[in-house]
Amino acid sequence: MAKQDYYESLGVAKSADEREIKKAYKRLAMKYHPDRNPGDSEAEAKFKEIKEAYEILIDSQKRAAYDQYGHAAFEQGGMGGSGGGFGGGGADFGDIFGDVFGDIFGGGRRQRASRGSDLRYNMELTLEEAVRGVTKEIRIPALEECDVCHGNGAKPGSSPITCPTCHGNGQVQMRQGFFTVQQACPHCHGRGKIIKDPCVKCHGHGRVEKSKTLSVKIPAGVDTGDRIRLSGEGEAGEHGAPSGDLYVQVQVKAHPIFQREENNLYCEVPINFAMAALGGEIEVPTLDGRVKLKVPAETQTGKLFRMRGKGVKSVRGGAQGDLLCRVVVETPVNLNERQRQLLQELDESFGGPSGERNSPRSKSFFDGVKKFFDDLTR
């Protein structure tokens, strides 16, 4: 089955900048997150699709490769998938194509020890952790430098020796018809060195599989889609080459009370209809504790109250966001006989559902309905 275009998956144009890509991903991730759609396999598949698209398009190098080659750019297995807690690093297109053309036209070169692969770790945070910042310990499996041979692959007391086939060049010349071409040495695989006495622990690879524990400091104000780079904490390189990096991908879990939009927080505050009509004070939650909200008389459902500075301070700096409380007027339930009687008396004092003085919107609505039916009968 053909893969969906990454730009279409996120609903953005090919010219979209990083901010637009992040905003689209955040909106879709909140919509299709498994926590919000338990048991929905279609939502889970969609979530994985947009996550994969985001991880490619937010990385400038991967995005450039995708724009040029499409999905074929990642079919060599180098980019890594989107599942699991961690994944492999990016493909080196210079190595993919350079080896082919180098062998044919004599441009082959001694193969240098490969830098270690980058790793990715998906970290879920609560809203409180994302807003305030947190330090978390994570455990990841990775290829680490062998502590016996210190990465050179040779048994202690010995060293890699010069390849007798290519004499350390890493290349050999071969005649093919009228042409003489250079190819990677089949004996040392282009490294110019061979290990005669391999390390007993890593068997000559210079690396061993280990799990390591890292302490990751998450700065205050991060949001879904943000990525934290830990330099040199990826997999160890081959035979002493530099290690790759670890990328911590942030995913903020849905909150039972608050919703975040950029640096602002939103919440719904239920009030009874008596307070809505008469006004009063009510306690509302913030991430810093409870505060009092003054509700004016004759407040209608849906009205937004802004509490300045009670939102999120962005990790990128700037002013702190606000908390916006949306009032929801609740209809009373489980009424006793006395309450029903009082409500009936109140309704009679209003003059019915279309009372002009006490319900101006209802009056306007019923006048509109009457005009509509009058027009139909003409």
UniProtKB/Swiss-Prot annotation:
Binding-site residues for Zn(2+) 1, renumbered to this chain: 146, 149, 199, 202
Alphabetized CDD domains for the sequence: DnaJ (cd06257), DnaJ_C (cd10747), DnaJ_zf (cd10719)
Cell compartment(s), UniProt: Cytoplasm
InterPro entries: DnaJ, DnaJ_C, DnaJ_domain, DnaJ_domain_CS, HSP40/DnaJ_pept-bd, HSP_DnaJ_Cys-rich_dom, HSP_DnaJ_Cys-rich_dom_sf, J_dom_sf
Pfam family name, one: DnaJ_C
Known cofactor(s): Zn(2+)
SUPFAM superfamilies: Chaperone J-domain, DnaJ/Hsp40 cysteine-rich domain, HSP40/DnaJ peptide-binding domain
Example of a GO cellular component annotation carried by this entry: cytoplasm
Primary localization: cytoplasm
Residues annotated as binding Zn(2+) 2: 163, 166, 185, 188
CXXCXGXG motif repeat windows: 146-153, 163-170, 185-192, 199-206
Cofactor note: Binds 2 Zn(2+) ions per monomer.
Domain of life: Bacteria
Keyword Cytoplasm: yes
A GO molecular-function annotation: ATP binding
Keyword line: Chaperone, Cytoplasm, DNA replication, Metal-binding, Repeat, Stress response, Zinc, Zinc-finger
Zinc finger (CR-type): 133-211
Domain J: 5-70
GO annotation, biological process: chaperone cofactor-dependent protein refolding; DNA replication; protein refolding; response to heat
Subunit architecture: Homodimer.
Record text about domains: The J domain is necessary and sufficient to stimulate DnaK ATPase activity. Zinc center 1 plays an important role in the autonomous, DnaK-independent chaperone activity of DnaJ. Zinc center 2 is essential for interaction with DnaK and for DnaJ activity.
Entry-linked HAMAP family: DnaJ (MF_01152)
Stated role: Participates actively in the response to hyperosmotic and heat shock by preventing the aggregation of stress-denatured proteins and by disaggregating proteins, also in an autonomous, DnaK-independent fashion. Unfolded proteins bind initially to DnaJ; upon interaction with the DnaJ-bound protein, DnaK hydrolyzes its bound ATP, resulting in the formation of a stable complex. GrpE releases ADP from DnaK; ATP binding to DnaK triggers the release of the substrate protein, thus completing the reaction cycle.
Similarity-based family: Belongs to the DnaJ family.
Protein name: Chaperone protein DnaJ
UniProt source species: Pectobacterium carotovorum subsp. carotovorum (strain PC1)
Gene this chain is encoded by: dnaJ
